Amino acid sequence: MSMEEISSCESFLTSSKPYFAMISLQFGYAGMNIITKISLNTGMSHYVLVVYRHAIATAVIAPFAFFFERKAQPKITFSIFMQLFILGLLGPVIDQNFYYMGLKYTSPTFSCAMSNMLPAMTFILAVLFRMEMLDLKKLWCQAKIAGTVVTVAGAMLMTIYKGPIVELFWTKYMHIQDSSHANTTSSKNSSSDKEFLKGSILLIFATLAWASLFVLQAKILKTYAKHQLSLTTLICFIGTLQAVAVTFVMEHNPSAWRIGWDMNLLAAAYSGIVASSISYYVQGIVMKKRGPVFATAFSPLMMVIVAVMGSFVLAEKIFLGGVIGAVLIVIGLYAVLWGKQKENQVTICELAKIDSNSKVTEDVEANGSKMKISEGDNSMLSTIVISVPLSETHLKKTIQEP
């Protein structure tokens, strides 16, 4: 191989790393959903699972936070502690417990599809808390609004409409066998539908809590901008303590805490190490190199992987309403992501213009240049460039005098 071929091959491998990392991460998330579903079906308490998951995550992340971020740690004031307390409550406690309950009552594929509502819900909360401003004249703003509406419509469709079973060629025989027992299980249909509706509502609340965590985390990240591992460790640790308190109140059976070398231990360890530790590190690297939009764009892949794995491992049935709703959610997701990407591009261009104008103004002032106002006919306009502090307006205004 020539040097050019070796160089192009190395360049291809380097550019492919973010794609490989995000695809691998989606397989990891898919495995977590399948393993957790099996564990919950065998009787594992979701309250206990949340405790073990975040205790393991804390134990895994804490050493890295200590060795890499122990210098110049931010001081934990009462205000910061309350923010950490709320983040621990929103993430490990509310989000995870509601998600696991919803997963127990529905299916892994359905749960993954509903989790794709996250960007739309985050956008709604950001608008309500005035973290994002709406400009209906801009195409990117229209895309985010339309994507949010389509995403919510898809979620509602998945919740209220099942429809016929969608046959996959490798599950057709299993579904025929299941239909032979339809008469003996018809009495369970009404209760099953109620559980499905309950699970759908729980998943919506879980996604809402997750989106709320992102909105609040954006504020505290200003303090922990250089200590993100420490922030994650604190959230997991505080969330673990809160989850223990909630479990003592909600779970009165002491044997629920017992765990052996079984699927329950695998679910707790896998979730804590892969979903709450490795995923954070991988996503952080990818987001720094390619941005958050790139990282989020791979989330629908997890739904496809879970659908295939679930049909094999759990003999999961896929309904037409779920397929149509999932397609709508994915369309809405990419519309929101496209709008967000365009908004970021516009913001970067504006900041670049401001920065270049600022440098020009500084050079002029440094050289002691004086601005000259040309006087001429009434039709001619004189222009004065006024430099305004960036922190006040973020713009340079051009004033025209008659």
From Swiss-Prot:
The chain crosses the membrane at residues 20-40, 48-68, 74-94, 109-129, 149-169, 196-216, 229-249, 266-286, 293-313, 318-338. One of its GO terms (molecular function) is transmembrane transporter activity. Keywords: Membrane, Repeat, Transmembrane, Transmembrane helix. The keyword Transmembrane helix applies. It holds the Pfam family EamA. Its main location: membrane. It is found in: Membrane. This is WAT1-related protein At5g07050. GO terms for cellular component: membrane. It comes from the Eukaryota. It is a multi-pass membrane protein. Belongs to the drug/metabolite transporter (DMT) superfamily. Plant drug/metabolite exporter (P-DME) (TC 2.A.7.4) family. Residues 29-159, 208-337 form the EamA domain. It comes from Arabidopsis thaliana (Mouse-ear cress).
